[in-house]
């Protein structure tokens, strides 16, 4: 037997080890609402090369893979978007335990953390990977789809086996939400690879009726974006103009997508989250937030460092990454903060890249990027998943001990 065949059979055996059942429980399939037409037609650009077959990012492709997945122990439609698209979550591992008897907030103040976490005997942590909160950013959606295909068949859509990633994932309970903002994905191109900066912004955050850019910062001046004033809203928000990443004000949640993610994390006691996005620079895991469980703030610096070192060693991230003792944190507030408060999870954001050439802007700390190949953009997700999951085996992401850490 040749080496490649041995690797494939080994990977396949690990992939089939996740399920332990032949049929996945499906929630939310029957009686689903019809998918309505988009208010704005999809934006198009001349000169974008056709996507390769392994770049599965269209809503129809996302739905098809989730519907045919069988190696997952369960799968759910956690909500429907305003247009009626299903938002799927696929579960790999044992998710048979009852709901928590309390929530994270109350459990954190009770006599033992086990009142929330329960008394699981397998010791496996729960890892949540979400992608496509911004629908115009397909790179991590492509990564998530290839990861699901790997978990299902032992090879991703490129035909590539990754026994190490499968081995690491088998030591966790894994939940994958391949695309949160299906509405934004429905009006966005398959990719923006090689597109110039102006058109990248047009596709992402949209433009006003006079043709001027809404802009990255500008898009956050509105919640929701006033759709009656735009020529095109971009794939950043959902079809009602809401930026799901910033639907993060307790007591005033506006989107079903954000509510569903928070319920998902709370229900399954998620330990760690990877939130997949894209930006203009070389791919990296960006700074974690300062508004989180204090222990998680420092820990996120350590994991960020290891993930970015892995990207650097793979030749994807060209510049050194700060060591944890010199790293800073972000004062920003977004759904990662609420995910942390929903289950005590450690949360980090991966920024893949749209991969276009732009001039260096030292004053803005923006690095020029090279034009990454499609396969490299998928590799980014796989590399970061491996580094993140490997770190959690050295030390649990969050404290789950029976005794209290503070107070009496």
Annotate each language-model stretch with its function.
Residues 3, 24-56, 158, 240-408:
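C-terminal accessory segments enriched in acidic
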Residues 1-16:
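N-terminal secretory signal peptides and thylakoid transit peptides that target proteins
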Residues 31-104:
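Short glycine- and acidic-rich boundary segments immediately preceding or forming the N-terminal edge
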Residues 96-100, 117-125:
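Proline/glycine-enriched tight loop/beta-turn segments at coil->beta junctions
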Residues 88-89, 112-118, 335-341:
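Short, surface-exposed beta-strand/loop micro-motifs that present aromatic residues
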Residues 129-136, 140:
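Active-site histidine-acidic residue metal-binding/catalytic motifs
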Residues 124, 138-293:
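Active-site/substrate-binding loop(s) of hydrolase catalytic cores
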């Amino acid at each position: 037997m040749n080496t490649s065949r041995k690797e494939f059979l080994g990977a396949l055996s690990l992939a089939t080890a996740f399920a332990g059942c032949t049929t996945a429980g499906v929630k939310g399939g029957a009686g689903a609402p019809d998918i309505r037409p988009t208010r704005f037609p999809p934006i198009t650009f001349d000169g974008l090369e056709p996507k390769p077959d392994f770049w599965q990012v269209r809503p129809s492709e996302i739905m098809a893979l989730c519907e045919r997945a069988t190696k997952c122990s369960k799968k759910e439609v956690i909500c429907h978007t305003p247009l009626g698209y299903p938002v799927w979550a696929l579960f790999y591992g044992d998710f048979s335990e009852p709901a928590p008897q309390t929530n994270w907030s109350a459990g954190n103040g009770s006599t033992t953390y086990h009142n929330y976490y329960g008394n699981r005997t397998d010791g496996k942590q729960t890892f949540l990977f979400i992608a496509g909160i911004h629908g115009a950013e397909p790179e991590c959606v492509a990564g998530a789809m290839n990861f699901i295909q790997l978990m299902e068949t032992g090879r991703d859509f490129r035909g590539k086996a990754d026994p190490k990633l499968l081995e690491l994932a088998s030591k966790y309970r894994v939940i994958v939400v391949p695309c949160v903002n299906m509405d934004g994905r429905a009006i966005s191109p398959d990719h923006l690879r090689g597109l110039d900066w102006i058109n990248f912004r047009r596709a992402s955050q949209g433009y006003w009726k006079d043709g001027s850019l809404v802009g990255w910062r500008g898009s956050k001046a509105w919640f929701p974006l006033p759709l009656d004033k735009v020529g095109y809203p971009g794939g950043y928000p959902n079809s009602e103009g809401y930026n799901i990443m910033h639907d993060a004000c307790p007591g005033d949640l506006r989107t079903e997508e954000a509510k569903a993610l928070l319920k998902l994390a709370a229900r399954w006691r998620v330990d760690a989250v990877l939130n997949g996005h894209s930006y203009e620079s070389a791919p990296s895991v960006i700074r974690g937030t300062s508004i989180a469980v204090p222990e998680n703030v420092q820990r996120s610096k350590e994991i960020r460092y290891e993930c970015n070192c892995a990207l650097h060693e793979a030749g994807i991230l060209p510049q050194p990454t700060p060591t944890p003792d010199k790293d800073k944190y972000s004062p920003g507030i977004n759904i990662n903060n609420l995910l942390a408060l929903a289950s005590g999870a450690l949360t980090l954001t991966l920024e893949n890249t749209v991969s276009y050439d732009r001039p260096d802007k030292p004053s803005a700390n923006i690095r020029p990027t090279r034009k990454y190949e499609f396969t490299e953009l998928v590799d980014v997700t796989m590399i970061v998943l491996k580094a993140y999951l490997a770190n959690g085996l050295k030390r649990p992401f969050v404290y789950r001990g029976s005794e209290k850490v503070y107070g009496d």
